[in-house]
């Protein structure tokens, strides 16, 4: 047994405890050695005593060194992560920026570890991507980040996935069960092509270790395209319920979200991106993977039957059982995460952005709040006559190309008894189009009810000011380039 396990390729799966990740895990465990990456120390402890060839690692995807260690020994890596749920007691920033930072860390770590292939399960997008809603746009950005290194990336794009534990499936079943009469907005006439979770897993398995799929992007879906309206009625048939519907000629996205939130039984934070995504029609484009998949694909009815119990209730999400304990850990850790996107001036490196930040800081808050910069690398935030509030110290040994890191090393506003060291980083992303300024694992000394209404807002104000400064520099560069071009043309 040990010998056969040692010969098998090793697959690292991040997002392995979610509904899709759990199905992938079960399908792959007989053929591969598996590394499950989880941000939850609770899950890492619960799953610690695994079978041969199975390993769980606690891995904070916001920490590039933790991700590097997490992917150590992996031949392949599957990325099934999104940031819909909080990872810190206070999280500031857009979900898109949190997702982008994690994907960038993952791609860099995969390259550093010599991973042979990455697989990513993304979202179907329409042919015209100029006006995408945020949920779809951020999935494309994750694709771009994962594909930015030398590691071959294979992307599968799916729409609605019908499987045990899925959030949107619970929403669908609750709506059908709770509403005998449904008044549907016009966007429910748009077509979708739901796919069974089992078929998603089949597609991932076919791609893994297959050089023909390197660098490829494939749309995948079930055997039938249907409108959302039809999908609701077919779901009612599976549940043995008679439902009446009428369609009204209006879009009403806000009303749709409110209606779904009231009757769908899922948090508002999840309703908002789900409805935004559903309203944009995206069809599965013909491709070889879809042709192969459709031959044995499950119908909507078969997929639903496999996803509910004998009473027609959705099977539980694998994460639900431990979530209260995970929330308690997040609260006990009491740290802050703040990620803000900023423009990157042309020809600026991450080092240039960090240097500009230190040059800009002394202008901040004068004369009451002063920032002194030592040797261009250490910043002291001082409040007269109180003393030093924060000290930022540049970490040269942890600042590779594209990333500049500062540790929070002291100050009156820092809880120095915390388990983690707070840090500020500037990360160049999306091919240099943007910079992410991120605070991680900062432990405030102020009581939380005071911190949230003072220091937390002050940090956002500082980041807003620096963003404006970078926008001004970008505009200056553009104007200078136009003037230079004009002079050259006239001469």
Model segments located where?
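N-terminal Rossmann NAD(P)H-binding glycine-rich loop of SDR-like oxidoreductase domains
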Residues: 5-31
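Mid/C-terminal beta-alpha module of Rossmann-like enzyme folds, strongest
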Residues: 9, 206-270, 281-334
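Beta-strand/loop substructures that line and gate deep hydrophobic ligand-binding cavities in soluble
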Residues: 414-453
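A conserved amphipathic terminal alpha-helix motif
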Residues: 450-488
